[in-house]
């Protein structure tokens, strides 16, 4: 009986204390030199923790796959950047995650590095949301 209670308490603790891989709101900054304008866009992306391990030794029978919190489903949305010069491309397309999971990072479609995408601020002085 005590082991059942312990398992129940452990599962409750894990569910409340450890955030799993889930959708989260983020703000990205978009600017174009030909527009001399900057906007902030609210979107969703995946964040959280995934169970992973790093083996001390390499075992050819068990490949070492690091799992990361990444998108399972993705859509693209387009926004028009205001203030663009005539004939300048004022459209910017950005990804929006609609579902997340813990899985192997696909380097063909995702930046799997530790570094971020760079600064999340505008280099122009006029910022509009």
From Swiss-Prot:
Cysteine disulfide links: 21-69, 35-84, 38-122, 46-100, 50-102, 105-112
Please provide the Gene Ontology terms (biological process) for this protein.
follicle-stimulating hormone signaling pathway; G protein-coupled receptor signaling pathway; regulation of signaling receptor activity
Q: Which domain of life is it from?
A: Eukaryota
Read off the Pfam families from this record. Cys_knot
**Cited InterPro entries:** Cystine-knot_cytokine, Glyco_hormone_CN, Gonadotropin_bsu, Gonadotropin_bsu_CS
Q: Name one GO cellular component term.
A: cytoplasm
Residues listed as glycosylation sites in the UniProt record: 25, 42
| Signal sequence, renumbered to the chain | 1-18
Name its cellular compartments: Secreted
Could you tell me the keywords of this UniProt record?
Answer: Disulfide bond, Glycoprotein, Hormone, Secreted, Signal
What is the predominant subcellular site recorded for this chain?
secreted
Which GO MF terms does the UniProt record name? follicle-stimulating hormone activity
Matching SMART domains, A to Z?
Answer: GHB
Q: State the similarity comment.
A: Belongs to the glycoprotein hormones subunit beta family.
Q: Which PANTHER family match?
A: FOLLITROPIN SUBUNIT BETA (PTHR11515:SF17), GLYCOPROTEIN HORMONE BETA CHAIN (PTHR11515)
**Assembly, per entry:** Heterodimer. The active follitropin is a heterodimer composed of an alpha chain/CGA shared with other hormones and a unique beta chain/FSHB shown here.
Described purpose of this protein according to its UniProt entry = Together with the alpha chain CGA constitutes follitropin, the follicle-stimulating hormone, and provides its biological specificity to the hormone heterodimer. Binds FSHR, a G protein-coupled receptor, on target cells to activate downstream signaling pathways. Follitropin is involved in follicle development and spermatogenesis in reproductive organs.
Q: What is this protein called?
A: Follitropin subunit beta
Q: Which organism is it from?
A: Cervus nippon (Sika deer)
Name the encoding gene, please.
FSHB
